[in-house]
Amino acid sequence: MKGFDVWAHSPSAVTGQWHALAEHVRSTARLARSFAVSFGAADLAWALGLVHDAGKCSAEWQSKLQRVAATGERVGIDHKRVGALLVRDRALAAAMAVSGHHGGLGRVRSLAALTPEPGDRETLRRFLAVVPEASALADGPSLLPEAWGESPMVGEMGVRMVFSALVDADHLDTAAHAHGLAAPRVAPPADMGGLVRRFEANRVALLAERGDGREVSDVDRVRAALYEDVVRRAVGEPGVYRLPAPTGSGKTMTAAGFALHHAAEHGKARVVVAVPFTTITQQNAGVYRDLLGDEVVLEHHSNAELDDRRLRLAAENWDSPFVVTTTVQLFDSLFGRRPARSRKLHRLANAVVVLDEVQALPMSLLVPILDALKVLTRHFGTTVLLASATQPSFEHLRVWDSLDIKPLVDAPVELFTRLRRVRYEWQVDPQPTLAQIAEQVARERQALVIVNTVGQARRLFRMVAEQAPAAEVVHLSTRMCPRHRETALTRIRGLLDDGEPVLVVSTQLIEAGVDVDFPVVFRALAPAESLQQAAGRANREGRLPGLGRVVVFDASDAPVPRFYRAGVSKTLGIFGPGRDPDDPALLDRYYRSLYTGLNVDEAERGAVIQASRMELDFEAVADGPERDGGGGKRDRGLAFRMIDEDPVSVIVTEYDPEARAAELVERLRTGSGPLGAVLRELRGHMVSLPRAVATAPHVRALCKPVIAGHEDLWEWQGGYDVHVGVDEEAIGEDTVW
């Protein structure tokens, strides 16, 4: 059998040419090797790429490919076993990358139990006839990098990395064939030095534009000094860095400046900025595009518009020098097992990863997250920057107790003191009522109130509107669709800029990096990190003649949500009059107390995930361990998932000034037009509801299916209030955001 007689893929619709298997596996091997150079596994990746499709040489597989080529059906015959068995003795657990390159990483026990089937010997003979260099892979020393043997967690991350390199290379070479390209499309190495020069030039111009016509404030001077001091430290060795920058100190720009300078200094391939909320992702990506250019910055999250094929490809594998994404995308990819999630993972090797608002990482997953970051920094050339005004004390957890965390600010207490722009007032004992808070807010000319749940926001909004009938009162929550929220925020910013009266009642979504500046902020009692984030919306630019006010209140008729109670309990014990939440020493004490109280070191979920990682059981990590009794059922509550809520999206057609949403929904129902493009256009009209809320009978009755069999997307047919969004009469009131 000659090389051109064995095919990997059916003819390209562009060229009409079949894809020769020998050509495909060699190209995949070369590409995977180039990806794995950055983490010292080039030879291993090459070997896996070379054998990954060996099973396609079976007569049965080739015959089926010929039959289905014209219809576009899948062959549906296993082709992974032969290649995995060929390299199993030398690649050990990494051979799972071959056995899982379509279905995903499994568990090492399944690989160990894998045995040849009748016909495999003949298939292997045919494969070696067309790819003779693969015969050398059967025997010899281990292909695994020596460092992977230092600990099970290093080996586990290595398997993930080489799996990522393989599946990305496989997809790229297959796509090149399908689109009639001469070679896979891979971006050239970034000129980080050039990006630094562009960033600095545009930063100076942007700051000059912002300051045009006004005096330089004390805040401006502190921001400038902080930036210069932090960037000077970018020459430091790769590792873990901490940026304890107060809200309003220019953290977004300073973190990016450090990351770019550090990348240029140390030959890093890219910068990945991960933030906890989509709203911040969009806002930060806009700033970075202004500084670096649209072609440099890849914005990757659920709401990103990626109409250009090049951008869609880059989003699949993060082949871009500057990526802005969410922590959900980052960590669900890092701990995922499916090829689509894992393709981008190898881009984290030899990269600078900025974790913005790092205090928002979920407590139940802290141990596996921090352990993975430690492995990345020690063995895969990654530098991690922890950026937050409320810096968690991760070094007090056992998983990081031996890690050297390099501070980028020598005197954080002095920095926070210089940038102190507010004074805290506490109304917690005696407790006020929401009506009393509404009375206080109504007496203000400009004020922001932040409460803990959607229901509380609705109630307080109506109370304030009743108390201040002549004022412009605006409500914000995620029960409003994104277009509605954008309109409201534009209105709020316009009134603030013009010095006009405006009173805003919001859930905590406004704390998520939304740049607004009020003279006074009222904040319902919450964990200390939320109080400080709220304070960042008061006197943000330091323009008031005195200090802004932050009023912390504990309303008797607005109880603290269950999931906040541990943090609130510690907050009340440590902070209060004269003991502000922006005191770094008190924050350190708060986090230590919180970690101990929640027993983060020993928390069940993190411990189970870590045990599954030790056992190289990638299914258990991503999908949860098998329940007692087997049967294939898994405990999803013990899986690695950044978002525990399983949300349902409802499309709001009523809030649509251009009357287009209804038309788009109809296109979804009839299947006219590309599904992805229609869904992207509808993002601005979607409201995300917790599944427990959406499936309640009285809510479900107001939802109409959009796509048959699709239980996560509905058309909302209930009321949509012009102020508060989805009709509160049909929705529960105890949901955050």
Where would I find each of the regions flagged by the language model?
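C-terminal accessory region of SF2 helicases/translocases
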Residues: M1-H9, F518, R540-W737
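Conserved RecA-like helicase motor core of SF1/SF2 enzymes
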Residues: R67-K80, H475-P482, E486-L489, E500-P561
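Conserved strand-helix element at the start of the C-terminal RecA-like helicase core
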Residues: R270-T281, Q440-A465, H475
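Inter-Walker segment of RecA-like/P-loop motor cores
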Residues: G293-F335
